[in-house]
């Protein structure tokens, strides 16, 4: 028996038969937007209501706060150079976290108007 319920049979095509679910962290109120960084062997995700981003380090199974405040980040991904790209709802822009930890705003306007919670 699977440790989860599926509502669409197509989901089974996405799951590797021998893969196991593993709880990585607790205390998140709304965890979403995972982005995996293979070179660093870590996973980053957003905990939107707690206004933070979390990080799971695969090498030692530790969980830590990656960024707080996160400005209600969401929609995370890794770019081709291994940098984090996020949509920050509160600040209404799309950012990139550089390798040195600095943050670059990639977009905050379209047609001269502010983005609306990207």
Residue ranges: model-predicted function:
Residues 1-118:
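Sequence-structural signature of mature extracellular/luminal beta-sheet repeat domains
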């Amino acid at each position: 028996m699977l440790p989860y319920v599926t509502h669409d049979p197509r989901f089974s095509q996405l799951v590797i038969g021998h893969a196991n679910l593993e709880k990585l962290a607790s205390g998140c109120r709304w965890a979403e937007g995972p982005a995996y960084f293979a070179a660093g062997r870590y996973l980053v995700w957003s905990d939107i209501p707690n206004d933070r981003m979390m990080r799971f380090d695969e090498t030692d199974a530790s969980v830590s706060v990656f960024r707080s405040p996160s400005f209600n980040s969401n929609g995370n991904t890794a770019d081709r150079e291994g940098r984090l790209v996020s949509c920050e709802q509160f600040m209404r822009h799309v950012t990139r976290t550089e390798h040195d930890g600095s943050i670059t705003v990639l977009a905050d306007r379209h047609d001269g108007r502010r983005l609306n919670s990207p």
